[in-house]
């Protein structure tokens, strides 16, 4: 169906999030993903310091890259499947095995990071707004996202699925971010 407010294509019937993400189901990570995380972390490290929130980092790929940065005090990772991967908290990496909720944030972050999360959000305008409200002026939000319409045009028809529930486009991303 097409959304009447933002005009994007989206799935009509959504699986409740607590059922969809009850168990981890993306267990393999290939070379492309590992390179993506390393490159994204290298980019982020040019700007970041202080306290960081990462949303959706179950395997801690980004957090492990970022923890090497001496300018970062802490990285709090929110994901519902952190512990099933055997992750352990460290002095710098804190684990919150839950869906991100602005009310559960203990201290103002200097940066919020989410890689390939935005396409999973059921109410992205509202959730991005809540994330941005946690940030002070001069803070950062780092996002990496697939562009679903371009993937589908390139023949990747699996880009829209039970987890990627709406057609992320560059224009829609711009509109979402400007609404914050």
What annotation goes with each model-predicted range?
Residues 141-166, 170-174:
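Short, glycine-/aromatic-enriched active-site segment of Class I SAM-dependent methyltransferases
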Residues 125-142:
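A short glycine-rich, Lys/Arg-flanked "PGG" loop and its adjoining helix->strand segment in the class I
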Residues 116-120:
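A short His-aromatic
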